[in-house]
């Protein structure tokens, strides 16, 4: 049976560490870390994600500043809001909640965020820092995956890693982080032919395809570490009526893969909690930098 890489447990441990970092620097800083969340529109899923991030801030002592703009907002208004947050001395990290409503291009808006306040690690400058191995905010989901692997002492040295998905949000930065850990990395995508022949070579398989239950036993090498980044809400069973509960799944068919894998992230409770925690890590690290405090989180921002 595969070892379950419990992101929920590690996230709780890291929250305690972040609390201690904040407590140690609070007197010298004169203020707590601040995270500004910019939400546009009323997408229900985005509302849930924003609420979860605000709760996490509250648990560790980060001040949360929410700005909620209507779906019909102009680009100029969004840019003005971002510029105001860039110069707000209470704010150490800025998060633009994605996805955006139709008609808004995330590229120019992400680029408008001060790279030193980039809580999501998605600014072009910070992606370049990652590419060059320079310090800076890191993309939250890939950084969370790396922390999970490190926590369970899963070595990447000379391992063959395959990342399914090439998004800027997950796939591309994930590949760079694995390379930096001395893995040999291949990136698969929607135009990759004979996917199984590639993934069966992987000692570490990271699946960020965005397709529910895409990966099964036929894709997995025995003994591989399988990281499932996907999360999907399955349709409710109409026969259960009001008793029906929403079910979640990932990109991996867990029941098929678990007997083969040496380690596996569950869905939910694997990568998801770590994504939120790494957002907090980026924010607290920026606070330490902005306030001239000792930087105690270097090992989490590889």
UniProtKB/Swiss-Prot annotation:
The UniProt entry, under InterPro entries, shows: Aminoacid_DH-like_N_sf, NAD(P)-bd_dom_sf, THF_DH/CycHdrlase, THF_DH/CycHdrlase_cat_dom, THF_DH/CycHdrlase_CS, THF_DH/CycHdrlase_NAD-bd_dom
Q: Which CDD domains match?
A: NAD_bind_m-THF_DH_Cyclohyd
* Pfam families, per the entry: THF_DHG_CYH, THF_DHG_CYH_C
Entry keywords, A to Z: Amino-acid biosynthesis, Histidine biosynthesis, Hydrolase, Methionine biosynthesis, Multifunctional enzyme, NADP, One-carbon metabolism, Oxidoreductase, Purine biosynthesis
Which GO CC terms are listed, alphabetically?
cytosol
Q: What is its EC number?
A: 1.5.1.5, 3.5.4.9
Q: Which reaction does it catalyse?
A: (6R)-5,10-methylene-5,6,7,8-tetrahydrofolate + NADP(+) = (6R)-5,10-methenyltetrahydrofolate + NADPH; (6R)-5,10-methenyltetrahydrofolate + H2O = (6R)-10-formyltetrahydrofolate + H(+)
Q: Coiled-coil stretches, from where to where? A: none
Q: Highest taxon of the source? A: Bacteria
| Residues that coordinate or bind NADP(+) | 165-167, 190, 231
Biological or metabolic pathway of the protein: One-carbon metabolism; tetrahydrofolate interconversion
Q: What Gene Ontology molecular function terms does this protein carry?
A: methenyltetrahydrofolate cyclohydrolase activity; methylenetetrahydrofolate dehydrogenase (NADP+) activity
Q: Which PROSITE patterns match?
A: THF_DHG_CYH_2
Q: Which GO terms describe its biological process?
A: L-histidine biosynthetic process; methionine biosynthetic process; purine nucleotide biosynthetic process; tetrahydrofolate interconversion
How does this polypeptide assemble, per the annotation? Homodimer.
The record's family statement is: Belongs to the tetrahydrofolate dehydrogenase/cyclohydrolase family.
Query: What does the function comment of this entry state?
Result: Catalyzes the oxidation of 5,10-methylenetetrahydrofolate to 5,10-methenyltetrahydrofolate and then the hydrolysis of 5,10-methenyltetrahydrofolate to 10-formyltetrahydrofolate.
Query: Which HAMAP family is this protein grouped with?
Result: THF_DHG_CYH (MF_01576)
What is this protein's record name? Answer: Bifunctional protein FolD
Q: Which organism is this protein's natural source?
A: Prochlorococcus marinus (strain MIT 9313)
């Amino acid at each position: 049976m595969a070892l379950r890489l419990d992101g929920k447990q590690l996230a709780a441990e890291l929250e305690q560490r972040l609390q201690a970092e904040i407590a140690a620097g609070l007197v010298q800083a004169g203020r707590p870390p601040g995270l500004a969340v910019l939400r546009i529109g009323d997408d229900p899923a985005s509302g849930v994600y924003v609420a979860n991030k605000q709760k996490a801030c509250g648990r560790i002592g980060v001040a949360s500043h929410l700005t909620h703009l209507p779906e019909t907002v102009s680009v100029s208004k969004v840019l003005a809001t971002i510029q105001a947050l860039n110069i707000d001395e209470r704010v150490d990290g800025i998060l633009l909640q994605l996805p955006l409503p139709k008609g808004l291009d995330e590229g120019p808006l992400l680029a408008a965020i001060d790279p030193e306040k980039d809580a999501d690690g998605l600014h072009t400058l910070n992606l370049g820092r990652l590419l060059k191995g320079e310090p800076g905010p890191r993309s939250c989901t890939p950084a969370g995956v790396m922390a999970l692997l490190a926590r369970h002492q899963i070595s990447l040295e000379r391992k063959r890693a395959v990342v399914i998905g090439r998004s800027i949000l997950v796939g591309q930065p994930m590949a760079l982080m694995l390379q930096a850990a001395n893995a040999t990395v291949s990136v698969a995508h929607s135009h990759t032919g004979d996917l199984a022949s590639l993934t069966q070579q992987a000692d570490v398989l990271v699946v960020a395809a965005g397709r529910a239950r895409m990966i099964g036993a036929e894709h997995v090498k025995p003994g591989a570490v399988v990281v499932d980044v996907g999360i999907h809400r399955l349709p409710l069973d109409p026969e259960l009526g009001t008793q029906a509960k929403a079910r979640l799944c990932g990109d991996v068919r867990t029941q098929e893969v678990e007997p083969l894998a040496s380690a596996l992230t569950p869905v939910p409770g694997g990568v998801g909690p770590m994504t939120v925690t790494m957002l907090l890590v980026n924010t607290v690290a920026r606070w330490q930098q902005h306030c001239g405090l000792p930087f105690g989180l270097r090992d989490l921002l590889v």
